[in-house]
Amino acid sequence: INKLNLSKEWVYVSMDLNGLKRANDSFGHVVGDELIRAAADCMKSSFSEHGKVYRVGGDEFVVIITKDIPQFENMLRTFEQRVANWHGEFVESMAVSYGYVFSSERKWNSIFDISKASDERMYESKKQYYIRSGMDRRR
């Protein structure tokens, strides 16, 4: 990721599973593992031919899109459909929050600044998800 060129066009996407702690606490880590694998599979099948998918934490992922940038919105819709249509062995559904930044949005000082902006957008998306769903995020 640190080798990305700030003068080229690419997209940085921060993604995070919603409700993983609740799933782990309520049903055990087998269920959490199923959700993490499913989210990764949805990301890979939606984005891999256009860039790379990285797992950067327990339920946190970064996607870097370097090809077909004009098709990015379509890639996101495909990803959202895959997540919405997924049904697991242990859990009925999953939800993933994301935020993204185009490298061309403005003059960035560093990739860290881009990742920070993307994370902030993802956390806003996550906050809205928990407000809409009525779930307590801390549980």
Model-derived segments and their meaning:
Residues 13, 128, 139:
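Active-site core of bacterial EAL-family cyclic-dinucleotide phosphodiesterase domains
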Residues 1-11, 18-48, 54-58, 62-63, ...:
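Conserved long alpha-helical elements within nucleotide-processing catalytic cores of c-di-GMP signaling
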Residues 29, 73-80, 84, 102-131:
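Catalytic-core segments of nucleotide cyclases and related cyclic-nucleotide turnover enzymes
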Residues 8, 49, 92-96:
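Residue-level signal for beta-strand positions within conserved beta-sheet cores that form or flank
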Residues 55-56, 83-99, 132-137:
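Catalytic core regions of nucleotide second-messenger enzymes
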Residues 12, 61, 96-100:
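A structural signal for short, well-ordered beta-strand segments
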Residues 63-68, 102-104:
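Short beta-strand-to-loop capping motifs
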